[in-house]
Amino acid sequence: MSQLAMLGGPRVRSRPFPDWPIFGDAEETRLVRTLRSGRWGRLDGGEVDEFERRFAEMHGCAHGVAVVNGTVALRVALLAAGIRAEDEVIVPPYTFVSTASAVVEANAVPVFADVDPKTFNLDPSAVAAAVTSRTKAIIPVHFAGQPADMRALAAIANERKLLLIEDAAHAHGSSYAERAAGSLGDMATFSFQSSKNLTCGEGGIITTNDAPLADACRSIQNCGRVPDGLWYEHHVISGNYRLGEFQGAVLNSQLDRLEEQTRRRDANGQRLASRICALPGVHPQARPAECTRHSYHLFMLRLESAVFGAPRRAVLRALDAEGIPCSGGYGFSLPRQPLFRDKAFGPYLVNASTRLDYSMARCPASDLLCEQAIWLGQNVLLGSREDMDDIARAFEKLYEHRHELTAAVRC
């Protein structure tokens, strides 16, 4: 192949990948209709109500409770589940900080159980080892859009009488054993932040098939009100976490696009994985048979630099030069974050601070992923089959020129 682009050679591709978000007349029509209605808040309009029903049904659930963002969705779910001071909640170390910080905001204790370095999801054996008499819930993250090992995690939860709350922020439209993500535990939370596969800029939702849990979520979402109570009658400590009608309007239109986009991402993700998995040291996220649909919020792989023949930092720079947008993801796992390493719980769990020392946490698989992971964003997977072949050719080109690549980084 030709010389590396970062050394003056031609790029593998010069065309951009699809922009994100994707929108059109449908979004504009709903937004203008909402604007002209004068019903901009959740209490007055019908867009959010419609979206809650549609999204819950699409994800195999009877109830959906929309909130202002995915972090709040996690916090509301934990409070609705009855998580209280110093309860322990098991979370993965390789995830966005909100999975654990929401536990802290609920006045509970996040306990880190390591991930499987092949799937990037919670390792059930690590979860089982982390359960104590204080444990009340497990939060598996469907990382990159691939459902966690829910059969094994559900068995642990059932045996120990624990709640199972899915963090499905990446998993809109994913499925496990033909069941939709979001319907696999007691509750699930989703995010509609700008980068997500379904977005309105900022937003979130809780899904469940448990009516009492749904009622509790709605009360916490709506200032502690209850259906039969007076307007200025408040039953629980909460806040106003209601999603607005403009966000609901965008989400309803975006939801119409989700099925086709998810099919495309899944097909392209599988094609790309099949093309690059034969390269030495390149390990795409392993896909168990139970993953019957992968939404691919991210296409993830692990790069063994010693086997591939070039360091990850050089590969990331070279891929970008070849026209392939990518990143290394998290720089360190959650126990290494200053929030947990230095501050533990700040003003929250003062009494627990003396027995918590996250500097001693051992999460070798998560730490390895922070050193080896390469991420491609979901919009890349909305391209064509030929676009996936371009990405594969870029990896092949880098492997062919691995020695020049390593030398260039040393200079």
Regions inferred by a protein language model and the residue ranges of each:
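PLP-dependent aminotransferase class I/II
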Residues: E50-R53, A62, S125, A137-V141, ...
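PLP-dependent aminotransferase-like
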Residues: L79-A168, S175
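Active-site PLP attachment segment
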Residues: S183-R225, E245-G248
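Conserved active-site segment immediately N-terminal to the catalytic lysine
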Residues: E166-C200, G229-H235
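Phosphate-binding glycine-rich loop
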Residues: G41-E88, A102-V104, V111-D114, R179
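N-terminal "arm"/small-domain region of PLP-dependent enzymes with the aminotransferase-like
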Residues: M1-G41, L376-G377
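Structural detector of well-ordered beta-strand residues that form the stable sheet scaffold
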Residues: V65, I90, V111, L164-I165, ...
